[in-house]
Amino acid sequence: MAKAAVRKPKKKVCVFCKDKVDYIDFKDTSLLRKYISDRGKIRARRVSGNCSQHQRDVATAVKNSREMALLPYTASAR
């Protein structure tokens, strides 16, 4: 049996770098919901495709948004 050709995964481009965003607002919950899982956890950098600086900014914005009760800390267990 021949091995299937292994494809290189396409590098994800940071959306914030591409759009030249300098500030991620914690009040923009529709944007931040893209970066949290259905269980309420912050998605990893390799999953979201953010650069390290913007991943830190997203994490800080999500944490601030949780503190202000705009986003949940966790989803309901069952």
UniProtKB/Swiss-Prot annotation:
Protein's recorded name: Small ribosomal subunit protein bS18
Lineage: Bacteria, Bacillati, Actinomycetota, Actinomycetes, Frankiales
GO cellular component: cytosolic small ribosomal subunit
Oligomer status and interactors: Part of the 30S ribosomal subunit. Forms a tight heterodimer with protein bS6.
Record gene name: rpsR
HAMAP family from the UniProt entry: Ribosomal_bS18
Role description: Binds as a heterodimer with protein bS6 to the central domain of the 16S rRNA, where it helps stabilize the platform of the 30S subunit.
Coiled coil: none
Keyword match Ribonucleoprotein: yes
Keyword tags: Ribonucleoprotein, Ribosomal protein, RNA-binding, rRNA-binding
A GO term, aspect molecular function: structural constituent of ribosome
PROSITE patterns linked: RIBOSOMAL_S18 (PS00057)
Domain of life: Bacteria
GO biological process: translation
Family assignment from sequence similarity: Belongs to the bacterial ribosomal protein bS18 family.
